[in-house]
Amino acid sequence: MDITIYLSLLFLGVYLAGLAVRRWIFLRDKRLMKSEIRSGGRAVAKIDELEPGCVKKFWLICQKYRIDAFLVNDQGQFHAYVNRCRHMATPLDFIRDQFLSEDGRYLMCYTHGALYEFANGMCVEGPCKGEALYRLPVRVDGDEVLVGCPEGDLKALAD
């Protein structure tokens, strides 16, 4: 067999295998999501799991799009935001799972240094000053924190 044909078939096989794996992961994740969804959103944390000033990453499937997000405990009040800096739409945690400024008082974009307030997601310092993170609806149900999907066109917020 000619080496060109062999390599073409090999690359085609690898490509198709990659598609199959991605499809399987998406369907598996979608099944997991369905089991965790209830009226009002997806349970993303237990109340006692997240201490004040702590942040937890999670994701949602909203209108067929995967939305990467995070939950922050602001002195017992929970807030959830899409994990996208308003400056360049990069994840805030460029350094894995690092969302807080050094003093722990602000959410921080580690790509551009933008600082955001916990309570309203407003950028108070940096290139996006005056803009707010995309907020997600949050409610507490018993001992769980539920986060719902935002309204509107979500294509720009998805990965």
Stretches with model-predicted labels:
Residues M1-L10:
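Feature marks short, highly hydrophobic, charge-poor N-terminal signal-anchor/signal peptide-like helices
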Residues Y6, Y15-S101, E117-F118, A132-D159:
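N-terminal pre-ligand scaffold of iron-sulfur
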Residues C85, C109-H112:
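Short cysteine clusters
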Residues F99-C109, C123-L133:
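Short cysteine/histidine-rich metal-coordination sites, predominantly Zn2+-binding motifs
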